[in-house]
Amino acid sequence: MKDLTERQRKVLLFIEEFIEKNGYPPSVREIARRFRITPRGALLHLIALEKKGYIERKNGKPRALRISKSIRNKIPLIGEIRAGEKREAIEYLEDYIEIPESFLSSGYDHFLLKVKGESMIEEHICDGDLVLVRRQDWAQNGDIVAAMVDGEVTLKKFYQRGDTVELRPANREMSSMFFRAEKVKILGKVVGVFRKL
């Protein structure tokens, strides 16, 4: 995805999210409205995405576009997550990274986050690793999750007892964080870790 402009990346992400939410692609006017540009400007972005192989379009038909088969296993890297104290989420599309299909759970959306910090080292999740997250809003005790509390995101092991949620680090030098269950939003479960050697 390094050949895309920042706006083209955002348009592509919007198309993917729109299709996931609605079951059909956005119209040129909906894209234009979302980015506060003219329909002609939106069309030029679609033409660029098509030329670069990210989407396929049928000229003259409304909503006749789809994500190219060649990028279906490319998962969005949408920023960083702290494996330490909870911090404000950094959510922007950085890139798409191809992931083998065997790592992906059928019927689920996935995204990648870059890990910052050392709170999960005893689970072999280190600073600089990429975690593959299966998007879901629930977790079982012991799952490693990306969780949001008061608008801030952290990577921790999840445990719930009654109406209390414990977000536990996998580092003996760090302490668990405890919250009322309604304050914790699960963004997804970690299902893979990738590291450059």
Curated annotation (Swiss-Prot):
Its EC number is 3.4.21.88. Keywords: Autocatalytic cleavage, DNA damage, DNA repair, DNA replication, DNA-binding, Hydrolase, Repressor, SOS response, Transcription, Transcription regulation. The active site is at S119, K156. Represses a number of genes involved in the response to DNA damage (SOS response), including recA and lexA. In the presence of single-stranded DNA, RecA interacts with LexA causing an autocatalytic cleavage which disrupts the DNA-binding part of LexA, leading to derepression of the SOS regulon and eventually DNA repair. The record marks A83, G84 as: Cleavage. Belongs to the peptidase S24 family. The keyword Iron-sulfur does not apply. It is an enzyme of class 3 (hydrolase). It catalyses: Hydrolysis of Ala-|-Gly bond in repressor LexA. Residues 28-47 bind DNA. GO terms for cellular component: protein-DNA complex. Homodimer. The keyword Ligase does not apply. No consensus sequence similar to the SOS-box from E.coli or from B.subtilis was found upstream of the lexA gene, suggesting the presence of another target sequence specific for the Thermotogales. Disulfide bonds: none annotated. The gene is lexA. GO terms for molecular function: DNA-binding transcription repressor activity; sequence-specific DNA binding; serine-type endopeptidase activity. InterPro entries: LexA, LexA-like, LexA/Signal_pep-like_sf, LexA_DNA-bd_dom, LexA_repressor, Peptidase_S24_LexA, Peptidase_S24_S26A/B/C, WH-like_DNA-bd_sf. GO terms for biological process: DNA repair; DNA replication; negative regulation of DNA-templated transcription; proteolysis; SOS response. This is LexA repressor.
